[in-house]
Amino acid sequence: MILRTLPILSLAFSALAAVPQSPIAEPTVLDPSTSKELLYLHRKLVHTESITENEKDVGQWLTKYLVKHDWTVEKQEVSKDRYNILAYGSKRETTILLTSHIDTVPPYWPYYHNKTTDIIGGRGSVDAKGSVAPMIIAAEGIKGHLQDDISLLFVVGEETGGDGMRAFSSWPSRPSSHEIIIFGEPTEQKLVCGHKGMLGFSLKATGKAAHSGYPWLGVSANDIMVEALGELLKLRQHLPWSTKYGNTTMNFGRVEGGVAANVVAETATAKIATRLAAGTPDLVRGQIIGALKDVKAASRAQGGDLDVEWASEGYGVVDINCDIEGFETMTVNYGTDVPNLSGDHKRYLYGPGSIFVAHSDHEALKRTELDQAVLDYRRLILKATEMRQKEQQQKQNDEQIEL
């Protein structure tokens, strides 16, 4: 495929040439017709169930919507019936990319809109269809100013490890021009300066089944697991910390073992998530192995065992650009697709709604938050583009001085 490319500097000037030079008034709400379209788009997205691995229907609907609104759409297959959606205007290679995810966590909760309180809820209403809809409306309202130098990417699989974004990152047909990438997640309408890293792992204890009346004839996997978790509880106090991100946390998300109260447990498992505030995954991995060393040795001496299985390589803290005037800033403890997209680019993280209600049975936000997100995304796009132009101009001036 032949891709249309333009020199980086000319892209910056061409984009800025169409941006109004006088300050733009910041209304508190969108105009009625745009707000109505936003509400419709958000409702359709939330109404369409898209729990991870089941994103086909929402992807098909969103593709039709974007094509109807004059976007060129490409679908990248991630796995059977699961597609990332890349949308752009007159050119495929753009400087600016807006991206979020269209999958949600289970279970599905239906859409609702309380017109008395103007609260809108349902699964994905915040995380992250609350970002997807405003991104699209914001891009449609500003792409003319930017001479179509903006594109959209909506990925699958963010909630279970980011297979969609990783697939896009390694896609041979991935556009190579993106220099400003804005990610959408619930951030309370603040710019995020970074988030914690992640290291997930599982423990598996193996014992020997026996009648509970004669426990000495067996080896309790549950006992092994309890001892292992006890050592990890002690380790929590010694995990890395930082001023910016606080303490590294370790959550015992799921623990199970045995088959009945009157049977010595033959197996036990635990799934654990560690949110890194400092250090590296290798450092914390070493701490975990060290903390469990004696438990593993003792279990083997009894005829049992304790194994650690790592969910992935993990990643350290993720620093994110937040140098745009006019936005409040924060750091967050949850993970995103930001580290899953490789490349040398400015990356921003913003979205309406709060992570505190995401993944819950009361996931919701106010309609005014959706409207304001459109205005904020537009402002973020323009400010980031202006900053890029200034940096390019400064670089050009420095090069001329050196000559």
Regions found by a protein language model. Give the residues of each.
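Acidic-glycine-rich active-site phosphate/pyrophosphate-binding loop
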Residues: 102-116, 178, 193-204
